[in-house]
């Protein structure tokens, strides 16, 4: 393996590690602050941290996702890991936007059908947590805008961009596949 590829893969690993560490730290800080604000003592907080119920209410989850997304976005943009420019928007890509909306809407029915066929059930704790979060009006902006924006900056802006520099144009599909696998792995 040449030095350029090794350096690029290390950089991708750093991006991934930073993104995960931000999530872990923000989860702990937001969870502990929330439990302290609710009047829990230290031993109850430790119990909640170990049993996974630290981020169980909708407001706390919403705050966690918002802070996590904002911190990750700011860090990756400010460090230059995910360069942002207006050149694409200045090209007025209205046809692309139109087709994205049409294709997104067009996938709803097939995905609903596939969901019914597979009968995949979400874990009860996850279902309760997201149901509680979606009762918060701001959660739609957090889950629909902030979180996807942060993930795009990390996985496409930093990770995929770096991987694409390591592959010949003919093999860009390898970089895209690696980025997709990393994205899926982070999402469990």
Task: Name these PLM-found stretches.
Residues 1-93, 116:
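N-terminal, membrane-interfacial amphipathic/helix-forming hydrophobic leader that caps
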Residues 39, 45-55, 81-153, 158-168:
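Juxtamembrane helix-loop-helix connectors linking adjacent transmembrane helices
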Residues 9-13, 17, 62, 97-102, ...:
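Hydrophobic alpha-helical transmembrane segments
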Residues 8, 20, 147-149, 153, ...:
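Hydrophobic transmembrane-helix microenvironments that flank and shape a buried ionizable site
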């Amino acid at each position: 393996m040449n030095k350029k590829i090794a350096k690029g893969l290390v950089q991708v690993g750093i991006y991934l590690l930073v993104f995960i560490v931000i999530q872990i730290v923000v989860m702990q800080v937001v969870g502990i602050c929330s439990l302290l604000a609710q009047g829990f003592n230290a031993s109850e907080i430790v119990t909640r941290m170990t049993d996974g119920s630290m981020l169980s209410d909708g407001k706390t989850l919403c705050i966690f996702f918002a802070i996590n997304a904002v911190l990750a976005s700011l860090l990756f943009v400010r460090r230059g890991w995910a360069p942002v420019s207006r050149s694409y928007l200045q090209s007025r890509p209205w046809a692309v936007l139109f087709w994205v909306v049409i294709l997104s809407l067009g996938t709803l029915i097939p995905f609903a059908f596939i969901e019914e066929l597979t009968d995949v059930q979400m874990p009860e704790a996850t279902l309760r947590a997201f149901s509680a979060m979606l009762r918060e009006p701001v959660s739609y902006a957090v889950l629909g805008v902030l979180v996807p924006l942060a993930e795009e900056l990390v996985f496409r802006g930093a990770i995929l961009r770096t991987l694409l520099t390591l592959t010949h144009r003919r093999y860009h599909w390898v970089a895209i596949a690696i980025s997709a696998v990393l994205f899926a792995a982070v999402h469990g």
